[in-house]
Regions:
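Catalytic machinery of carbohydrate-active enzymes
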Residues: 1-225
Length: 225
């Protein structure tokens, strides 16, 4: 999500630009939301980590390496700058641009990059990725220019009546270890309910929806989406 505005701003500066996007298969829908993304190449980091030396992992990696090196790219940029993305950058037979040692999210991800760019770590992730791509492509980023460029027409609009003021509680997370307990969410809902503010809990799949419904079951002011 954080990289989408960087693509939109690149389009404002380079009219005929387009992108291929490498992403973990669990998040493959995200780049499909942006009209500038031509091809999506998926990785399978979670299974690779679980059984790195297995035959299936070797075959999966070989397939990904072939896909990564099919395109004749003008530029390859690692927007994530962590160890997982650096591993993918290492597999690409092309010079890769990424953040330098002082800027990268995880050490020593910067070692995978041929060209290293300094980006202020104090910036929000969206601004960091915009600045990285802007420096890589040679244009100056605009502050507070955040356009996700998502094709919202492809999303189903919830059939709900929104109050003038409401709170969105994002209870879902990609890793179980990052999830707050249902009991903690319900305690938060009770406290917000005391303030008289309605709450919405969005979900991205059926499992998340069931969890959101359980969390909301204690209050008529909380709604699972």
């Amino acid at each position: 999500m954080h990289a989408l505005p960087a693509l939109s701003e690149a389009k404002e500066n380079i009219n005929d630009i387009s992108f291929d996007w490498v992403v973990d298969k669990n998040f493959a829908s995200v780049p499909s939301w942006h009209p500038l993304v031509d091809k999506i190449i998926t990785t399978d980091h979670r299974n690779w980590k679980k059984q790195f030396f297995s035959k299936d992992t070797r075959e999966s990696l070989r397939h990904v390496v072939n896909k990564l090196n099919e395109g004749n790219y003008d530029l390859v940029v690692d927007m994530q700058n962590n160890l997982k993305s650096a591993f993918i950058s290492y597999l690409i037979k092309h010079d890769v641009i990424g953040m330098d040692a002082k800027s990268a999210r995880e050490f020593p991800a910067h070692l995978a990059y041929s060209n290293k760019i300094n980006v202020d770590k104090r910036l929000h992730a969206i601004e960091r990725q915009k600045e990285l791509l802007g420096k890589a492509l040679g244009y100056k980023c605009k502050k507070n220019n955040v356009n996700f460029g998502a094709l919202f027409k492809n999303f189903v609009k919830p059939n709900i009546e929104l109050a003038n003021e409401y709170i969105v509680l994002v209870q879902n997370a990609s890793w179980i270890t990052k999830q707050w307990s249902i009991e903690n969410w319900q305690e938060l809902i009770r406290r917000i309910e005391e303030k008289g503010v309605p709450m919405l809990l969005p979900s991205g799949n059926l499992e998340e929806l069931e969890r959101a419904k359980e969390i909301c079951s204690i209050s008529d002011m909380a709604q699972a989406l």
